[in-house]
Design a protein with these regions (language model features):
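Nucleotide-sugar donor-binding catalytic core of glycosyltransferases
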Residues: 1-45, 49-60, 68-69, 77-84, ...
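Non-catalytic N-terminal targeting/anchoring module and adjacent flexible stem/linker
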Residues: 1, 14, 328-335
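A charged, aromatic-enriched C-terminal amphipathic alpha-helix characteristic of glycosyltransferases
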Residues: 294-326
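Active-site proximal beta-strand in glycosyltransferases
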Residues: 88-103
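C-terminal "capping" alpha-helix adjacent to the active site of nucleotide-linked donor transferases
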Residues: 280-298
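Short, amphipathic alpha-helical "lid/cap" segments that border enzyme active or binding sites
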Residues: 58, 62, 282, 286, ...
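N-terminal Rossmann-like NAD(P) cofactor-binding module of classical short-chain dehydrogenase/reductase
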Residues: 74
Length: 335
């Protein structure tokens, strides 16, 4: 979510707008680890529950809004919002918008807060009609950051035959355990804690660490191949009903980085990337990776075609779309 937040901030800035950032992420981190010293020398959590942490993290926003008095407040994700605060802002003429990043996996949570925003921007339009019955909703595609995601030579430490950056959801772990990566230098990165040793041995950083988007992009540049594997979890449960239509951010970032990848079939993915092969089984994925490694010319041609397709998938374009939906874009007139 932080990467998406950074991208949207850059998008608004590149359009010439003044952007003030409320450091919600820092406050959430501090609130989750803060402890209070007791008279007996022991320590207790300053904010015992997740709800307490959220309340603390968001508590400084009203004061910030009073100082800044913006035309629009844009939340990214929005799971920590105070609905009453949003309604006060709307009553004072301040537009409220939310970039909802978890469609279609967590629609139930997102739909609960959607009515409190003037506009919601969805990363997948599968259930957009449900949102349109509650508020103004637009589909803003996943985007890349040209200063981060670009083609080039990577440092030797980041090079591999194949890379996958993401979270080790149970569905992904089960899939990857069935893949034959024998003889393939596989690099995994992201959140892979509590995964089997057969998976964890491929993680290229300390399991307790996280990697940022700059490191992710460097891994993409250093990989000969990659693949996209959608999760099947929603709110912690494995379900069959959360398949979406849109591509994920991984596909856009890989394409922008000029990296070939195998993919699972989805509506938008099939429209954008017919030049890249699809797989349905772990066995098929292994075969595709081996084919790509053995055919560098064909691999590079397909990667370049995919790169050209995503040229316009940028955050400034998304920011313009969101502001237009808020009624904050002046229409150009002739003469």
């Amino acid at each position: 979510v932080q990467d998406v937040f950074d991208g949207w901030c850059e998008g608004f800035t590149e359009l010439g707008h003044e952007v003030k950032q409320y450091n919600l992420g820092d406050r959430l981190t501090w609130g989750s680890v803060a402890h209070l010293g007791m008279d007996d020398g022991t320590y207790i959590k300053a904010f015992p529950t997740t709800r307490d942490v959220y309340s603390f993290a968001i508590s400084g926003l009203p004061q910030s809004v009073l100082y800044w008095w913006p035309q629009v407040i844009v939340f990214v994700s929005g799971f920590t919002v105070d609905p009453q605060f949003l309604e006060v802002c709307r009553g004072r003429g301040i537009k409220t918008a939310c970039v909802m990043t978890e469609s279609p996996y967590e629609e139930s949570r997102q739909l609960l807060i959607a009515p409190h925003f003037d506009v919601v921007a969805l990363n997948d339009p599968t259930n957009i009609n449900q949102y349109l019955s509650l508020t103004t909703a637009v589909y803003t595609p996943h985007a890349y950051r040209p200063a981060v995601h670009y083609e080039g030579e990577a440092h030797a430490d980041y090079q591999s035959d194949c890379v996958f950056v993401g979270t080790g959801y149970p569905s992904r772990v089960a899939f990857l355990e069935r893949c034959n990566f024998s003889g393939i230098d596989l690099a995994l990165a992201g959140n892979w804690q509590n995964t089997p040793a057969s998976i964890a041995e491929h993680v290229v950083h300390d399991l307790e660490d996280c990697i940022d988007n700059d490191q992710t992009a460097e891994l993409y540049r250093g990989a000969k191949t990659s693949f996209n594997l959608y999760r099947t979890e929603t709110n912690g449960d494995v379900v069959d009903g959360c398949d979406g239509w849109s591509v994920g951010p991984r596909e856009i970032e890989l394409a922008a980085s000029g990296t070939w990848f195998a993919r699972q079939s989805r509506g938008e993915s099939d429209e954008l990337f017919p030049m890249l092969p699809t797989f349905e089984s772990p066995e098929e994925l292994g075969e595709l990776i081996r084919w790509a490694l053995a055919n560098p010319v064909e691999r590079q041609i397909a990667a370049q075609q995919a790169k050209r397709v995503v040229t316009d998938r940028t955050f400034p374009n998304n920011a313009h779309m969101l502001l237009a939906a808020c009624g904050l874009v002046k229409e150009e007139t002739d003469g």
